[in-house]
From Swiss-Prot:
Gene: frr
GO BP terms: translational termination
GO molecular function: ribosomal large subunit binding
Protein name: Ribosome-recycling factor
Function per UniProt: Responsible for the release of ribosomes from messenger RNA at the termination of protein biosynthesis. May increase the efficiency of translation by recycling ribosomes from one round of translation to another.
Subcellular location: Cytoplasm
CDD domains on file: RRF (cd00520)
Database matches in InterPro entries: Ribosome_recyc_fac, Ribosome_recyc_fac_dom, RRF_sf
Pfam family of the protein (one): RRF
Length: 185
């Protein structure tokens, strides 16, 4: 029971870190990057579909992204979704594909994005800590029900604390890396 609780907690913490990676990857830096478009989608036959599944996204130059829809009929919808996103870019449609010139970030916008990255990192750490709290509750329940002794539960709690610290450190590292990437001119 204890091993199951620890394994489940670690799995959930891993998912929280993965979500944090995705969230931080969607924050645009001064360079063109296909990951910028992971969170942008359109209504495609009644279902929200990310544009990464509807088009090929290439980066031929450091500040240029080319989006080529698999279906020409989706060109306008994809262009509108990109324009309405919070990326702050202005796509140009030539009838076959969409070109997006990624402008240089202003100092003010960089600081805004760093705050956003820190906020997303803090959300991920809260998520990891919530998983820890639920696992601790589960360990207490196991001890109370007499399924494990106090020593076993104590060791499991120490192991859980180490695991939590490891995942919180991973999130901190991701945020630090993103911050350095954003502040790099």
């Amino acid at each position: 029971m204890i091993d199951e609780a620890l394994f489940e907690a670690e799995e959930k913490m891993e998912k929280a870190v993965t979500v944090a990676k995705d969230d931080l990857g969607s924050i645009r830096t001064g360079r063109a990057n296909p990951g910028m478009f992971n969170r942008i989608g359109i209504d495609y036959y009644g279902a929200f579909t990310p544009i990464t599944q509807l088009a090929s996204i290439n980066v031929p130059e450091a500040r240029l992204v080319v989006v080529k829809p698999y279906e020409a009929s989706q060109l306008g919808a994809i262009e509108t979704a990109i324009r309405n996103s919070d990326l702050g870019v202005n796509p140009s449609n030539d009838g076959n594909l969409i070109r997006i010139s990624v402008p240089q970030l202003t100092e003010e916008r960089r600081r805004e994005l760093v705050k956003q990255a820190k906020s997303k990192g803090e959300d991920a750490k809260v998520s990891v800590r919530n998983v820890r709290r639920k696992a601790m509750d589960e360990l207490s329940r196991i001890q109370k029900d007499g399924e494990a002794g106090e020593d076993e539960v104590g060791r499991a709690e120490k192991e859980l604390d180490k695991t939590t610290a490891r995942y919180v450190a991973q999130v901190d590292e991701l945020v630090k890396h993103k911050e350095a990437e954003l502040l790099e001119v």
